[in-house]
Amino acid sequence: GAGRIVAIEEREVMEEKQSYYILEMPGEVKVMIPTATAEEHGIRSVINKEEAQKVMSVLGQDETEMEKNWNKRYRENMDKMKSGNIYEIADVVRNLSFKQKEKGLSTGEKKMLYNAKQILVSELVFAENSTQNEVEELIDNKINSSYAMFRTDEGEIGKVASAGSIVNKFIPFNG
């Protein structure tokens, strides 16, 4: 998830002096990462507001084709998570959220969804300068509205057009 660099310090580890980023992570956890290998460890700048909107756009799309075999699907999603690409992580959140609504998830996929969502939330909190609760609600609303848009059966009487609003269809009575 997202953290904040609070300091850069020189430390001697195994008789070698190095510069370290001191990162403060959620839950007041501090992590030291050598500055020389920061990129290799996936350290990057937090996304900006424009990129945050692109993340929300990914959440608002229909799910992408997923492997039917849960083991292969799990590995594919794990690779997306490990990539550190925020858009790939948003893809995992959306796809697993849709699958959870339709068929439910295995214990492993539930945990993956939780972890992916936490990564998204932690990044969007910084990008949007919002609270965790606000961002969680934003993500949930976006997923619910996109699920309703792409998965609502056209044969239903009422259809959720967007989060919180219902559009009733006119059905003529031939009686």
Each model region followed by its residue ranges:
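Short, intrinsically disordered C-terminal tails of secreted or membrane-associated proteins
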Residues: 169-174
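A positional/architectural concept
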Residues: 1-41
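Charge/polar-rich, low-complexity and marginally structured segments
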Residues: 42-155, 161, 175
